[in-house]
From Swiss-Prot:
It is found in: Cytoplasm. PROSITE patterns: ENGC_GTPASE, G_CP. This is Small ribosomal subunit biogenesis GTPase RsgA. Keywords: Cytoplasm, GTP-binding, Hydrolase, Metal-binding, Nucleotide-binding, Ribosome biogenesis, RNA-binding, rRNA-binding, Zinc. One of its GO terms (cellular component) is cytoplasm. Pfam families: RsgA_GTPase (PF03193). Monomer. Associates with 30S ribosomal subunit, binds 16S rRNA. GTP binds at residues 156-159, 215-223. Its EC number is 3.6.1.-. GO terms for biological process: ribosomal small subunit biogenesis. Residues 9-20 have a biased composition (Basic and acidic residues). One of several proteins that assist in the late maturation steps of the functional core of the 30S ribosomal subunit. Helps release RbfA from mature subunits. May play a role in the assembly of ribosomal proteins into the subunit. Circularly permuted GTPase that catalyzes slow GTP hydrolysis, GTPase activity is stimulated by the 30S ribosomal subunit.
Amino acid sequence: MAKRRLSKRQVDRIRERQSQRLDTSVAAPDGKQLGSEQAGLVIAHHGKQVQVETLDNSDDSPRRLRCHLRATLGSVVTGDRIVFQEDDSSGIIVAIQPRSSTLVRPDSYGKLKPVAANVDQLLITIACAPEPFSGLIDRYLAVAENLHIRPVLLFNKLDLLQSDEIDSAIANKVAKLRTLYTSLGYRCIDTCAKNGDGLDELRNTLQDNTSVFVGQSGVGKSSIIKKLLPDQEIAIGALSDAIDKGRHTTTHSELFHFPFGGDCIDSPGIREFGLWHLSPKEVTYGFIEIRDIAGLCKFRDCSHTHEPSCAVLNAVEDGSLHPERYENFQRIVQSLDDVNMQG
C-alpha cells in the first residue's frame, strides 16, 4: 500500500506536538531531574500551578500531584489531558493532548481564553427564581451546537412552582419554556435539589460523561452538584433577598468525579463564557430550526430581517418558527455586530 501523503497542516501539527515534547530530561524548578513521561488529567487550576491526576496507573488508584506549567505550552485548563514528568513531590506538564472541545470566555482585555476542555455535555440550569430568560438559554444552546457538545436543559427548584413564593406569571413562563425546548427536540429534566426529585434521571444523564453546569447565578447549580457529591466540600451561595440575585460561590476551576461514573467541571469562568468567538453563520448553525431552513432563502447573504423570499421570515409568519426564538436569534447576531464595531 502506498504511503499516505500528509497535508501541510497535518505536518505542521505533528511538528508542533513534537516540539512540545522535546527535551524529556528537563529539570524541575529546584534543579532535580524529572522522570519519564506520564499521562494525566488536569483536575484543578490554582494560578500558575495545576493539580494533576495520573491516568496510567493500572495497578494502583490514581495519584494526585501539583504540576508546574512549561512557559511555551499556552493555556492549560481543567479537563485537559496532558503529558507530565515528575520528581519526588511535583511535576512539570510538557504537552497537552488534542482537545475534543474547549469552552472560552473573554478576559479583562477582551481576549478569548479557554476555561474548560473536553466537555461532553452542557447542563443548562433554569429555575423560576431568579426569573429565566430565553435569550440566555439560546446563547448557551448556540455555543453547545457549534462545539458539538450535547445540551441538556435542567429545570430546577420545582418545589417553588407549587408554593406561593412565585408569581403565577413566572410559573407559566417556565412551563412555556419547557414546552418550547421540548418541541425543538432538546432533552429537559425536572429536578429539585432540595428534596431530591429528578436526581436519579440526572445521574443517568451524567454517567460516563464530562459535564458542565451553566446558568444564571442562584438557579441552584452548586446545590445540585452537592447533592450528587455529598462527600465533597462545595461552597453554596443562597439567593440574595436584597437584590434577588445569587452570589458566585466557586473561586477556582475544579473537576469532580461522580461516584456513579462521569465527571463534572465547576468554574466561575464557565458561567461567563459567551458568543464573542462566533460568526453570524455560526449563530445560524446554533439555532437548529433556523439552520435547517436558512439555505432555502433566495439570497445567499440573506440577513433574515427584510429580504424577499426569506425562508426564515416565512417560517415566522406561518408559525413554524417560534417568534421568541427568532427575536433571540436576531439579538445575538446584532450583539456580535456591536462587539465588532467596538473593536
